[in-house]
């Protein structure tokens, strides 16, 4: 995974259940906004993110990255969230900023249970 984008590494580690290892990729003073249906969770440090991640309901959840990109010190991902390797519960768009040491110092994600920008493509089973 040495050539993987940090955003790919972050989701892979998070989905493996290693929450502490995922949070270790974050700068201590990370700022984040996580927009979920009906609410936005904001935080201002690594501890806030750890509290959020540990507070999520226990479920076999996986982020399937359908698109990734980077532009300088900002990385992007678009994908679906799949539970129990069967049910797609929604789609997300995420962006993160990396500091000069490569740590994630800002993170923003939005999640929608219905809308996908790739609806037509997914309906035809196409994927890059």
What function would you assign to each model-found segment?
Residues 1-18, 25:
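Short, aromatic-enriched amphipathic alpha-helices that serve as compact interaction elements
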Residues 2, 6, 48, 88:
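Soluble or luminal CAZymes and related metallo-dependent hydrolases
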Residues 9, 21, 76-78:
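Residues within well-formed alpha-helices
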Residues 19-21, 27-71:
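A solvent-exposed, acidic/Ser-Thr-rich amphipathic alpha-helical stretch
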Residues 50-128:
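A beta-strand edge to alpha-helix "cap/lid" segment located at domain peripheries
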């Amino acid at each position: 995974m040495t050539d993987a984008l940090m955003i790919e590494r972050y989701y892979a580690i998070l989905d493996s259940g290693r929450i502490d290892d995922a949070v270790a990729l974050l700068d201590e003073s990370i700022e984040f906004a996580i927009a979920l249906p009906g609410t936005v969770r904001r935080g201002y440090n690594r501890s806030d993110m750890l509290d959020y991640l540990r507070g999520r309901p226990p479920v076999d959840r996986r982020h399937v990255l359908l698109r990734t990109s980077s532009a300088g010190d900002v990385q992007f991902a678009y994908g679906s969230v799949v539970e129990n390797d069967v049910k797609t519960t929604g789609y997300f768009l995420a962006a993160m900023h990396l500091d000069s040491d490569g740590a994630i110092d800002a993170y923003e994600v939005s999640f929608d249970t219905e809308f996908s920008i790739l609806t037509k493509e997914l309906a035809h089973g196409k994927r890059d």
